[in-house]
Amino acid sequence: MSSSQVVRDSAKKLVNLLEKYPKDRIHHLVSFRDVQIARFRRVAGLPNVDDKGKSIKEKKPSLDEIKSIINRTSGPLGLNKEMLTKIQNKMVDEKFTEESINEQIRALSTIMNNKFRNYYDIGDKLYKPAGNPQYYQRLINAVDGKKKESLFTAMRTVLFGK
């Protein structure tokens, strides 16, 4: 089996593992999971899909197309040569090996298995400090959207710290 085929197979394993990775509870502009899936789907030779499983046709040019445009032309869109060289130097050229992808698979699986959370267990002394034992629970409830504070309880928390 050629090395590129081995890299593709490893990237497919990584994409499958990333698809099992839970979505962020707090929605950001860019999700780690989504960015990594799109990145390694390209390496694995798989088509990009949206949340519903439909294939996405890429409207944007790929990184290789941009590089070829820059290499073929002396000054596209009125850019001077200095600017082009700066752009070329900043572009990331990812060359994956089987070993590097397997390292990523190992790292992601340890994160998903909560290996270090279990290894470095934090006791109740940190989660429920003596001065304000409900502090972290109140934050977690606010993030999850379970229990909202009223204006009175919010003012009490600000004034008295509890």
UniProtKB/Swiss-Prot annotation:
The modification N-acetylserine is found at S2. Keywords: Acetylation, Mitochondrion, mRNA processing, Phosphoprotein. It comes from the Eukaryota. GO terms for biological process: mitochondrial respiratory chain complex III assembly; mRNA processing; positive regulation of mitochondrial translation; protein stabilization. The keyword Oxidoreductase does not apply. Pfam families: UQCC2_CBP6. It is found in: Mitochondrion. The keyword ATP-binding does not apply. GO terms for cellular component: Cbp3p-Cbp6 complex; mitochondrial matrix; mitochondrial ribosome; mitochondrion. The modification Phosphothreonine is found at T97. One of its GO terms (molecular function) is ribosome binding. Present with 2130 molecules/cell in log phase SD medium. This protein is involved in processing of the 5' terminus and the intervening sequences of cytochrome b pre-mRNA. This is Cytochrome B pre-mRNA-processing protein 6. It comes from Saccharomyces cerevisiae (strain ATCC 204508 / S288c) (Baker's yeast). The lineage of its organism: Eukaryota, Fungi, Dikarya, Ascomycota, Saccharomycotina. The gene is CBP6.
